[in-house]
């Protein structure tokens, strides 16, 4: 534990276009090599494309996608007497949002569409409809936690 205590939480910057801190977080997850304007162009293009394709408010689509991808349980490794157990633990709210954004961006990078804007747009639409690789990742995480429920008493 550091002597100075935990690092202070930074104030959440609200997105100038949509007025949502979730959009800012998504831009920061898409960001590569410090090229923020490129990341903003990708995210705004994806949100506009989602708006045109679904006809819904893009921030609502993003929130629905996040709700469908956010994990409630995950497994953590815990070493007990020479054996390593996968112990299911509940996920904090901030971490679940971060994981959901990370999974959405990661799986959109692996998609087959031509541009990152299209990939992110389609992954967001799929996730908001309960489909896609990022939703499957959440289901796999929950399944892993469910199958290791016997080790829940090792929780810390």
UniProtKB/Swiss-Prot annotation:
One GO biological process term: translation
Classification via InterPro entries: Ribosomal_uS7 (IPR000235), Ribosomal_uS7_bac/org-type (IPR005717), Ribosomal_uS7_CS (IPR020606), Ribosomal_uS7_dom (IPR023798), Ribosomal_uS7_dom_sf (IPR036823)
Gene Ontology terms for molecular function: rRNA binding; structural constituent of ribosome; tRNA binding
Keyword field: Ribonucleoprotein, Ribosomal protein, RNA-binding, rRNA-binding, tRNA-binding
Any Pfam family the entry gives: Ribosomal_S7
One GO cellular component, as annotated: small ribosomal subunit
Summary of the function given for this chain in its UniProt record: One of the primary rRNA binding proteins, it binds directly to 16S rRNA where it nucleates assembly of the head domain of the 30S subunit. Is located at the subunit interface close to the decoding center, probably blocks exit of the E-site tRNA.
Family to which the UniProt record says this protein belongs: Belongs to the universal ribosomal protein uS7 family.
Subunit architecture: Part of the 30S ribosomal subunit. Contacts proteins S9 and S11.
Protein name per its UniProtKB record: Small ribosomal subunit protein uS7
Protein's organism: Parafrankia sp. (strain EAN1pec)
Gene, per the UniProt record: rpsG
């Amino acid at each position: 534990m550091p002597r100075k205590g935990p690092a202070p939480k930074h104030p959440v910057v609200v997105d100038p276009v949509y007025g949502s801190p979730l959009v800012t977080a998504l831009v920061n997850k898409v960001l590569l090599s410090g090229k923020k304007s490129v990341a903003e162009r990708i995210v705004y293009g994806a949100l506009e494309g989602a708006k045109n394709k679904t006809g819904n408010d893009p921030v609502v689509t993003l929130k629905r996608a996040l709700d469908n991808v956010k994990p409630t349980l995950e497994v953590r490794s815990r070493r007990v007497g020479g054996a390593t157990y996968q112990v299911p633990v509940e996920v904090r709210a901030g971490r679940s949002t971060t994981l959901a954004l990370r999974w959405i961006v990661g799986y959109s990078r692996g998609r087959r569409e031509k541009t990152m804007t299209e990939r992110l747009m389609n992954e967001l639409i799929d996730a908001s409809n309960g489909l896609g690789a990022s939703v499957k990742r959440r289901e796999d995480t929950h399944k892993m936690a469910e199958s290791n429920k016997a080790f829940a008493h090792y929780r810390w």
